[in-house]
Every structure is written in C-alpha cells, then in structure tokens.
C-alpha cells in the first residue's frame, strides 16, 4: 500500500488538565484546616488530587504555583512524556482504504479487465506493481487509457488470485492459504509484486508436506523461487525413504528422482538395496498410475507386474525395453557395489532382471579388484577426506530408533573384513571394530589397524515430515584397532525426540589410484 502519514492529537490526562486549569485561575480550591491540620500536619485538598498528609508547614506542596521539588519533578515528568515518542497503529485506516477504494472502487481512475471480470482501481496504487509502473510511465498506449484489457497467459492464474493480488496493493497484509499459494504466486509474478512474491515463498516454505512438496517444487522452478526449491528438495531427501508414500511416488518426476537418488544426503533407511526396492516401486507407479492400493501391498504388486514383463521381454533387462529406457538415468545413480556385496540382495537384483547384466558385470569386476587390494596390498582404509569420493561413492545406510533404550546392530554386506558394530546407549552412539569378541557371518580382517571415512547424521521429524532437530559429525576419518570402540556422538537429552533416525555414509577402502 502507498505510504501514509498521520498526526495523532492527544487529550491531556485528566489530572494534568485540572492542574493546568488551576494554574490559569491563579490558585487552587482549599478546604479549611481542622483538627490535626492546625498542628502542622494538614491535608491537601487541591482540585484533582486525593487527600494526603503534609509532612510539615501549612502550605500545599501540590499547589501549581509552589516552588517545590515535587512541582519540579512533576514538570520533569510532563516534559519526559512530551518527548517520549508514541506509536499508535490506526487499525481502521488500512481497512477503510481497502473497503472504500478497492472493494467499492470509489474515485477509480482506471478499469482493469481480465478473465471476464472487471476491477475499478487507481493508478497511484497500481504503480506499486512493476508491471503497471512500466506501463504508465513509458510511451505505451495504455498509459493514457482508462480501460485496460489484461492478457493472462498463465493457466495457474484465476480470478480469485487476481483479486488477492490487486487487493494487496490496498492493504498492509494478506492472508494466503496453502491451497491458493501457487495461483497467487503466479499472479504476483505476472504483476511483478515483489512483496507478495516473497510472502508466497515464505508460506510455501512453512507448509511443505507430502501433499504440497511436488507442486511447490515445480512452481518454485517455474517462478524462480530458488529458496523454496531448495527447501522442497531437502524435505524429499529427508522423507523419501523414512516416510514412504504411494501418492508421493506417483507425483515424483524422473528429473527430481534422479537428483534424490544421486545425492549422498538421501536419508536412507537400512541399506542401498532398499533404495533399489523403492525405485522399483516408484517406476511401477509411474507406469501404472491407476494402481490404487496401500503401501504394504505395493511391493508385492510391483514384483508381480515386473514378473509378467520378463515373460514378454525374455532375455532383455527391463531398463533396455522401450518402457524402461526413460528410467535409465535414475537407476544409473544406484551404488550397485553395496547391493552385490550381500548375497541375498545380489540374487534378487539378478532375478528381477530390471538392471542390465552389463551394469552388474562391471561392478563385480570392480569389487573383486578392491577385495584383492584389501587382502594383498596392505590396504588399511582411507587416510584422508576425499569429499568427492564420499559424495559420489560412499555406502549409504540408516536405522530408525522407535524409542529410547539400548540398541546394537550391524548393516548387512561384505565390507572388506571390517565388521562394524553400532551401539546406541545412554545418549551415546558408539562404533566398534569387531574381530574376535562377537560372532560374524563373514570373514574378518585381523590387521592391527583399519581406517574408515564416515559421516553420521541424526534427525527427528514432526508429523508433516518437517525437521525438528538434527546433528551431524561431518566427514571424519576413524582408525580402530582390533575390537576397539569409539564414541562418535554424544547426544544432548534436550534433542532426543523419538522416533530418532540415524543415517551414515561409509568408505571402507581408499579409491584405487590411477596410473
């Protein structure tokens, strides 16, 4: 709304007003002294005052003409009040302008027509819009027109959104419902209303959830709200695996899913094989969007559907078919080396025949050479932080702790003889390199020292998937001797909100040096 200024003329307080009148009259009303008053402890009956005892003498300390300390103090107080700025919001002003000028259209000097509706507005208010400011100040023919036909090329904009956008020029604040924010944002961008665009962005960031995230992400990209786009991507990285949802899988585009699966910040639950399983379910829902079952039924239905496809395309991986080719770029971001390191997972991915066998063959070869280096080439693990390698090739795994208590676990898979046990107890998270103390299903390295590069993240979410609290160790190198354990995180009890989600990234061996 345009700048407004006002002066507020204040009435003097009653007591001060009466004293001022007494001063102008040259005196004050006095009652005759009686009783103790004559003894030197009289009472003051000045107009506008309460009866009060005088400490000594028969004159009145409250008399406006008395040259006393009390009078000086009162004068100082009045002076202080006169020089103290006061702020008073005229609540009715904005409402009056909005009602009279915008809703009633009084004294309108221009009409805006759009989408079959007409608004009686005022150029002085419309100039707050970059769109109309350029129109009126330039050499456009519309600058002298009283009726302007506004073309609306954006299908997101409707009459209600234009009503809110135009109305925002006549008022200080606008209430935006999450269900209407995209339409209002579209109108605000068309009219170049920076303040309203910013308010839409804040509303979107505050209301990201499973129902809004995909729409917000798309709209943020369309209208250039990078901060909203980033917020949506963060929400998806945190919730895609931790709070799987059928409708969300249907809405997620190939481009967005590619970003999520390729990120080392994806909050994984369990292991890489679970990312593959989630991708398989997502791809099924992209191809069969009419499916309408529950999350519990989804994996079974997915496997049945892909089983039928294998019969139709015998000898060909699904990603090599015409139906599957659009999804290749997403599945390329799977870290297959952490899937084939577990026997059960390797068998499933071979049987599914979703991923081309050539992809798997190259990974088998890569891991075989890595194992030989670990066994025969004095490989003791990473010795320095290689962020690029960690971001692109680290093992991703996680665990949900439903309530406080004691937990001890290991993530499945062959990790080059490094059997890592993770313990949560008494607000501590502990890593232990197990060699001989506890049974292990695979072979265990007996090297005196082994190192790993890791990052541990911890998070809690509210019912909408919004991050409540989080902590991270950042990327670190940890060297452990046989059966040695190390506290990697000490948790503040104030941050312990269950369920608690733990996610880790690991590198067990150094990347092979290229000759």
Swiss-Prot record:
GO MF annotation list: identical protein binding
Modified residues (Phosphothreonine): 68
Annotated Low complexity bias: 11-29
Compositional bias of kind Acidic residues: 67-76
Main location: nucleus
Keyword Ribosomal protein: no
Entry annotated with the keyword Nucleus: yes
Cellular component GO terms, alphabetical: nuclear matrix; nucleus
Subcellular location, record wording: Nucleus matrix
InterPro entries registered for this protein in UniProt: BACK (IPR011705), BTB/POZ_dom (IPR000210), Gcl-like (IPR043380), SKP1/BTB/POZ_sf (IPR011333)
Highest taxon above the source species: Eukaryota
Keywords noted in UniProt: Developmental protein, Differentiation, Nucleus, Phosphoprotein, Spermatogenesis
Domain BTB: 108-178
Gene3D superfamilies: 1.25.40.420, Potassium Channel Kv1.1, Chain A (3.30.710.10)
Phosphoserine sites (modified residues): 66
Positions of the UniProt region annotated as Disordered: 1-35, 65-85
Subunit structure: Interacts with TMPO-beta, TSG101 and TFDP2. Interacts with EMD.
Function: Possible function in spermatogenesis. Enhances the degradation of MDM2 and increases the amount of p53 probably by modulating the nucleocytoplasmic transport.
Protein name as it appears in the record: Germ cell-less protein-like 1
Gene: GMCL1
